[in-house]
């Protein structure tokens, strides 16, 4: 690597790299997935240049690995993301999210009358594929919402 081609975000020795996140989505992922609730170092790259996307976000979390469920839950926000498992500075595993059947403990129901706002329950949504959209159905109020409505909440 020449001095003209240096990394824009420092490499990590061990942990997870979430790459190819659509620009402006990185912070939302950190918040929704509670990725900052750790004492491990997190490196965030925002609006980085990308050949295929134009611009992208990137998240690196040291000494932390995402479960398969967590990776799949990224599909609503970053369907083209790549989740890399890093060990000793090398990529030892690579996966892409696929739409799960359910998303638990991440989203908030947009229905202000939903019991999930008043009771200490974990959110839970069924993921329903529609012709031109992805709908999310709340386990508690049983209302269906376009995924964009829930994501904006």
Curated annotation (Swiss-Prot):
Subunit annotation: Contains catalytic and regulatory chains.
Record: residues binding Zn(2+): 109, 114, 138, 141
UniProt protein name: Aspartate carbamoyltransferase regulatory chain
NCBIfam families in alphabetical order: ATCase_reg (TIGR00240)
Cofactors, names only: Zn(2+)
InterPro entries membership: Asp_carbamoyltransf_reg_N, Asp_carbamoylTrfase_reg, Asp_carbamoyltrfase_reg_C, Asp_carbatrfase_reg_C_sf, Asp_carbatrfase_reg_N_sf
Keyword Zinc applies: yes
GO cellular component terms, A-Z: aspartate carbamoyltransferase complex
GO biological process entries: 'de novo' pyrimidine nucleobase biosynthetic process; pyrimidine nucleotide biosynthetic process
Family: Belongs to the PyrI family.
GO molecular function, one term: metal ion binding
Keyword terms of this UniProt record: Metal-binding, Pyrimidine biosynthesis, Zinc
Co-factor: note: Binds 1 zinc ion per subunit.
Organism: Shigella dysenteriae serotype 1 (strain Sd197)
Presence of keyword Cytoplasm: no
One Pfam family hit: PyrI
Role played: Involved in allosteric regulation of aspartate carbamoyltransferase.
């Amino acid at each position: 690597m020449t001095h003209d081609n240096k990394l824009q975000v420092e490499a990590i020795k061990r942990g997870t790299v979430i790459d190819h996140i659509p620009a402006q989505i990185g912070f939302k992922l950190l918040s929704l997935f509670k990725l900052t609730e750790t004492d491990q170092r997190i490196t965030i790259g925002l609006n980085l240049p990308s050949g295929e996307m134009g611009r992208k976000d990137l998240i690196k979390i040291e000494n932390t690995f995402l479960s398969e469920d967590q990776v799949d839950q990224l599909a609503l926000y970053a369907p083209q993301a790549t989740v890399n498992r890093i060990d000793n500075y090398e990529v030892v595993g690579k996966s892409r999210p696929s739409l799960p059947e359910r998303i638990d403990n991440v989203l908030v129901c947009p229905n202000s009358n939903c019991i999930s706002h008043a009771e200490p329950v974990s959110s839970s949504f069924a993921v329903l594929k529609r012709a031109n959209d992805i709908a999310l159905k709340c386990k508690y109020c049983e209302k269906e919402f376009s995924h964009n409505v829930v994501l904006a909440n």
